[in-house]
Swiss-Prot record:
Organism placement in taxonomy: Bacteria, Pseudomonadati, Bacteroidota, Bacteroidia, Bacteroidales
Species annotation: Bacteroides fragilis (strain ATCC 25285 / DSM 2151 / CCUG 4856 / JCM 11019 / LMG 10263 / NCTC 9343 / Onslow / VPI 2553 / EN-2)
Family as reported in the entry's similarity comment: Belongs to the bacterial ribosomal protein bL28 family.
InterPro entries the record matches: Ribosomal_bL28 (IPR026569), Ribosomal_bL28/bL31-like_sf (IPR034704), Ribosomal_bL28_bact-type (IPR001383), Ribosomal_bL28_sf (IPR037147)
Family annotation (SUPFAM superfamilies): L28p-like (SSF143800)
Protein's recorded name: Large ribosomal subunit protein bL28
Length: 86
């Protein structure tokens, strides 16, 4: 599974570790990413999403249906990649 939020489209970033002597080595800044199940009322099923904490706050603010429609419109996910559970 890739490290991309399905609601916000955020990805893991690449940067540098900087030591005291200012030597730089590559590192990744990972997301606060987790898998979460939601009950999708419109289709009467459970869906599983991979999202970050900001994506969860967006779902709490807008609602699941509006957040999914916005994510599909912006191209962060499509209806084929949303996993239907059980």
């Amino acid at each position: 599974m890739s490290k991309i939020c399905q609601i916000t489209g955020k990805k893991a970033m690449i940067g540098n570790n900087v030591s005291h002597s200012k030597r730089r080595t590559k590192r990744t800044f990972d997301l606060n990413l987790f898998n979460k199940k939601f009950y999708y009322v419109e289709q009467d099923c459970w869906i599983s999403l991979s999202l970050c904490a900001a994506g969860l706050r967006i779902i709490n603010k807008k609602g699941l249906d509006a957040a999914l429609n916005d994510a599909v419109a912006k191209g962060y996910c499509d209806w084929k990649t949303i996993k239907v559970v059980g």
